[in-house]
From Swiss-Prot:
Name the record gives this protein: PRAME family member 12
Source organism of the structure: Homo sapiens (Human)
GO molecular function annotations of the record: ubiquitin-like ligase-substrate adaptor activity
Keyword Hydrolase part of the UniProt annotation: no
Assigned keywords, A-Z: Leucine-rich repeat, Repeat
Gene3D superfamilies noted in UniProt: Ribonuclease Inhibitor
Similarity comment text for this entry: Belongs to the PRAME family.
Gene: PRAMEF12
Amino acid sequence: MSLQAPPRLLELAEQSLLRDRALAIPTLEELPRELFPPLFMEAFTRRCCETLTTMVQAWPFTCLPLGSLMKSCNLEIFRAVLEGLDALLAQKVRPRRWKLQVLDLRNVDENFWGIWSGASALSPEALSKRRTAGNCPRPGGQQPLMVILDLCFKNGTLDECLTHFLEWGKQRKGLLHVCCKELQIFGIAIHRIIEVLNTVELDCIQEVEVCCPWELSILIRFAPYLGQMRNLRKLVLFNIHVSACIPLDRKEQFVIQFTSQFLKLDYFQKLYMHSVSFLEGHLDQLLRCLQAPLETVVMTECLLSESDLKHLSWCPSIRQLKELDLRGITLTHFSPEPLSVLLEQAEATLQTLDLEDCGIVDSQLSAILPALSRCSQLSTFSFCGNLISMAALENLLRHTVGLSKLSLELYPAPLESYDAQGALCWGRFSQLGAELMKTLRDLRQPKIIVFSTVPCPRCGIRASYDLEPSHCLLNACCQGGFI
């Protein structure tokens, strides 16, 4: 017969606190701070809303990372937490142990709860994230309470917790500092976005992603808010279209309205654009407005003119560039000089270069090779999808001998791998792949390298040849179509 172990002190405290709400305040006054997180988790799990309200008031840590505990919206619990904040805000003089300054609604700090429950140790990454949260700019002096959240607009509506919080926050304007670090837009009416932005401190926003199709006219309505995000580091724009109905002079006015916002962004470093056309012939206007060196320029499947590339190559802000991605921009008829100059400008810092599916031909490749060979920090190079001969590829590989940090290399299948009609000759591709691998191994020891074909017209998959001959890959649906 086994004896049941006596309940631990923590379990007794949980039972006492959660059984009798009237006992909560006196108990919390004397409770060791180490017991607060596990007790809070237990009250959260049991949905003891009155107890949660009381614990929020008496929280003995500067930060309450609620977001990592509340994985999905539970309006009842969320209201209980906000009621605790109301009680805290109403206190003109707080008890010494009541230290809550930050309510963090982001899902970033699971280890806070894990360490108190004994599940894990607090990681340096988690500590870093919590310190970062406290570095938010606070204009006009310290605010009594900061609420940190990331905003993600999708499915056309706001979730009920966010809706409730925004309404609650409006009624307490001046008492709260609502800090949003990341803003993601996947689909919602622009007037709803503006309504939300009017409730947060725009100075706090560091990353913005617009991942839904917008007309240029909608982007322009958003642009003034972008200019107020003075700590913005990263901007992502997907599928910004220009209506055929917009007159040319009106479009140019829109471009000025958008690009001028960058004059106010002193810390901007990372520009990502996919399928954006309105800057064609106007990229120089944006580049002139940049206030800080760029680390990342990603412009994929965008419309750019040769003059745009030339302006980019001479822009002072790209001299510390770490990532350049021009994937899907057709460069076939461009002079190779701007790209060569661009690589020269960034040769000391460039780590990632993606020129996939740019339509680059042998003569252009030959012109940029001297600059490419001096990019000493390059670790990732993607060049597949270009129309390059066997001789030009061998020359390219020879020019990578000094690039000791290369860890991922993606190259196109040689033109000789295809027949006159453009169909892949699989046997020929395998033979040429083996020759290229031998050439490369005679020069240096590659880490990850792949030679791949153009996408199959039937399935869209690229056949590839990597370091080991046994790893030649060919999509099964295409077997019959290859020689």
